[in-house]
Amino acid sequence: MTDEKLNDHTVKAPEYLPDILTVESLDMEAQGIAHRADGKVVFIEGALPFERVTANVYRKKSSFEKAVVMAIHRESSQRVRPACPHFGLHTGACGGCKMQHLHVGAQVAVKQRVLEDNLWHIGKVKADNLLRPIEGPAWGYRYRARLSVRYVRKKNAVLVGFHERKSSYVADMTECHVVPRHVSDMLVPLRELIAGMDARETLPQIELACGDTVTAMVLRHMEPLSSGDLARLRAFAVSHPGLQWWLQPGGLDSVKLLDEGVPELSYDLPEFGITMPFKPTDFTQVNPHINQVLVSRALRLLAVQPHERVIDWFCGLGNFTLPLATCAREVLGIEGSEALVARSCQNFKKNQPASQSRSALSATEFVARNLFEMTPAMLVKDGMADKWLVDPPREGAFELFKSLAALHQQMVTGVPCDDGEQQQSLVLGDWTPPQRIVYVSCNPATLARDAGVLVESGAYRCTLAGVVNMFPHTAHVESIAVFERG
């Protein structure tokens, strides 16, 4: 993977004269929003709310314009000096962060507004109350990352890091403040390692995954590695204790350890006495500090009682399922992947105490189900549950909530719901909808859409909603919402 340029490309000169504008707010991409006298919207990179700035417009459309801040005439009290020298609007700036120039408390406020705006404008939903934001360390939090690799033949140099802002080029990074310190300290040695490898031109990326005590790096290689390269990787691991190399010659199913017999990756949920083993290609939360607080908060919001049955939808490896098994009578974890279901079962068995030193986990079952093709009949088949925990990917849980709303309508009106195959009344027996749902979301737009389905049906109201600052200094909005039946 060669690149004949080492961040020496120039910025295209602006096509329009600068304008002085007053910034009103930030959008979901952390761009300042201003309006011209005629009402036309201008999105300004690098500008903050309440600032008065000179902005260079570089793109004009009929309904909006794009600009970049050139000078600040009135500065926001929330503007701070970025911690990282690679952050900014300059040529070659890293695109991994978007908000380092904004105080972290103000970042959370912006994300809260984004959540509320999405709930209202997309779902026509307004939460009864706002949750206190879940916050944690602002730096060194990112335990998962995909680092791009580029060999620059003319310079005989290697770049390892995130992409440049608004570019496919790899940023010339020597440090990173959002990954753990020991990973940041490895960036320059990694560049030197790869520059000396025989396969340096065919190594496109490194997938980073940190556990509590082990750091895994998955090296994607497009051709077989020489014995010399394997020896170089092993020597690098020896010089960086706790590091293990995984190799990926093809798709995800090709990932394997360079050397067996090393400690497994895992993270702890100490409040619940749970240890979660995982592989570097598994989905785990990027921010382990926030994850611990999020799991604790979600279970408190569910308020699970010892006699209750709970379903954990999109359960993954059991991040919420196993803690739920410490307090519920019975738990059902449902996931789309058969492989993940098998791994969840393994994690459950590993955490089931062999002695009486602590309480056993409750009866827990894991099943595979295509959650993007849910029907009312499938919901009834999974049985009644007192509470639900829903933690979907960015696509959300639309079919799940649509099926739940349809069953509610059948119960209220007696009109048959569409079970996806035939139009007929389902025999519900003693099935009833869950009394409470806690929804953990990584996309406020799909959360708002799904919330609208529930609330419009008349079955539920949104009692609580709030943000989870899982990704400080980025525009990513993680959130949590609570829905109460009746």
Swiss-Prot record:
One of its GO terms (molecular function) is rRNA (uridine-C5-)-methyltransferase activity. [4Fe-4S] cluster binds at residues 84, 94, 97, 176. Residues 10-71 form the TRAM domain. The keyword Nucleotide-binding does not apply. The active site is at residue 442. Keywords: 4Fe-4S, Iron, Iron-sulfur, Metal-binding, Methyltransferase, rRNA processing, S-adenosyl-L-methionine, Transferase. Its EC number is 2.1.1.190. GO terms for biological process: rRNA base methylation. S-adenosyl-L-methionine binds at residues 285, 314, 319, 335, 370, 391. It comes from the Bacteria. It is an enzyme of class 2 (transferase). It catalyses: uridine(1939) in 23S rRNA + S-adenosyl-L-methionine = 5-methyluridine(1939) in 23S rRNA + S-adenosyl-L-homocysteine + H(+). Disulfide bonds: none annotated. PANTHER family: 23S RRNA (URACIL(1939)-C(5))-METHYLTRANSFERASE RLMD, RNA M5U METHYLTRANSFERASE. Catalyzes the formation of 5-methyl-uridine at position 1939 (m5U1939) in 23S rRNA. HAMAP family: 23SrRNA_methyltr_RlmD. Belongs to the class I-like SAM-binding methyltransferase superfamily. RNA M5U methyltransferase family. RlmD subfamily. This is 23S rRNA (uracil(1939)-C(5))-methyltransferase RlmD. The lineage of its organism: Bacteria, Pseudomonadati, Pseudomonadota, Betaproteobacteria, Burkholderiales.
